[in-house]
């Protein structure tokens, strides 16, 4: 059964062309569809609190484990598919820098001596970033969490070293190579376009490995905390409040959704927070204690989680859901209606407006959303 699913998935993936969806730094929405098995989240329906977390753990915990490095299929191979540059399939997108880089220019490949420093190291080769640092709970390569590809991202070698084991939080100074990132002594702030991706990886990890088991069958529980944890190798990581905000500000895009599908094709487990972003509200947010149901994504939570971005904008507005036969109205701050437009099967709106602040009213089948947008 797993073999059939995997073959079907690969066929679907290979059908993509370079123009199907965008990279993280120029995101698209609504092109890549989630292929969630019909009953995948069924046992989580109607649950809340710890019961909901336990059900999600049971759903995603029994995944297929691949070796970290091997002559057979390993994490290097999977990442070259999951993080492939949609605009150049010979390349992959590196986390933090957003750089498109030849898949072969990686640690240990031996094929790119022209890029090496005098001591034989390749400071700009790519290696594997553990988004949840491996030293915070699973330091051994034989541990399942160590090789979980949901937690791995291709990264510039020197940038990976700079991030180290720092927590994620706002603030710091601009990094000299990953120029969209900020860092200080105890934290790392990724680029705006990847913030939500990072947050959802960490949300996955804290559900998947609560509890986790190392190669000696000793248990550990990963936990997100609301503070930074410098010089600490406990299985904790911060900063939860910042991660929740990043999850809100940077919604799931096509690149992230496609990555989830690729990894599911190999590991046979999914990231629930990519499939159902509203789960964050039920585990850490305003809906704690309320029963979650998968069908909520199709009703009131659509409008509650609907977002418009980027904001400020140069004139192109994106919605994080696809709009089909729904009306958009634009008003000045004085209440004058400037534009009314029917949106059909798209999530993008191009505006030709003077610089200023406007109110966008979205009249959808889920409800009405009023948003203040800055055009610059």
Predicted regions and their residues:
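Boundary/junction segments of secreted and surface-exposed precursor proteins
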Residues: 16-60
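Short, flexible beta-strand-to-coil junctions
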Residues: 96-102, 206-208, 363-364
């Amino acid at each position: 059964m797993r073999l059939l699913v995997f073959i079907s998935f690969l066929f679907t993936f290979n059908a993509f062309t370079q123009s199907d969806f965008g990279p993280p730094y120029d995101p698209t929405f609504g092109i890549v569809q989630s292929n969630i098995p019909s009953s995948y989240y069924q046992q989580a329906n109607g649950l809340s609190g710890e019961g909901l977390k336990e059900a999600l753990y049971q759903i995603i915990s029994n995944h297929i484990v691949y070796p970290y490095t091997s002559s057979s299929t390993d994490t290097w191979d999977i990442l070259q598919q999951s993080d492939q540059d949609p605009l150049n399939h010979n390349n992959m997108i590196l986390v933090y820098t957003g750089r498109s880089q030849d898949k072969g220019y990686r640690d240990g490949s031996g094929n790119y001596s022209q890029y090496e420093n005098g001591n034989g190291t390749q400071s700009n080769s790519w290696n594997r970033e553990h988004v949840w640092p491996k030293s915070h709970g699973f330091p051994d390569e034989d541990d399942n969490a160590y090789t979980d590809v949901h937690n791995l991202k291709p990264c510039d070698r020197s940038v990976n070293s700079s991030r180290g084991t720092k927590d994620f939080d706002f603030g710091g100074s601009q990094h000299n190579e990953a120029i969209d990132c900020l860092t200080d002594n105890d934290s790392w702030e990724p680029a705006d376009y990847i913030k939500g991706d990072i947050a959802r990886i960490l949300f996955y990890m804290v559900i998947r490995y609560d509890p986790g088991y190392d190669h000696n069958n000793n248990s550990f529980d990963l936990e997100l905390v609301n503070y930074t944890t410098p010089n600490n190798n406990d299985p904790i990581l911060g900063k939860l409040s910042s991660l929740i905000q990043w999850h809100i500000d940077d919604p799931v895009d096509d690149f992230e959704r496609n990555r989830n599908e690729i990894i599911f094709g190999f590991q046979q487990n999914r990231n629930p927070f990519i499939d159902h972003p509203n789960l964050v509200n039920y585990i850490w947010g305003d809906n704690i204690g309320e029963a979650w149901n998968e069908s909520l994504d199709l009703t009131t939570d659509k409008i509650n989680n609907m977002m418009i971005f980027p904001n400020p904008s140069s004139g192109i507005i994106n919605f994080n859901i696809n709009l089909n036969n729904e009306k958009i109205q634009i008003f000045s701050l004085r209440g004058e209606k400037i534009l009314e437009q029917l949106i059909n099967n798209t999530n993008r709106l191009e505006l030709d407006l003077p610089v200023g602040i406007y109110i966008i009213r979205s009249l959808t089948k889920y409800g009405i959303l009023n948003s203040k947008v800055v055009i610059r």
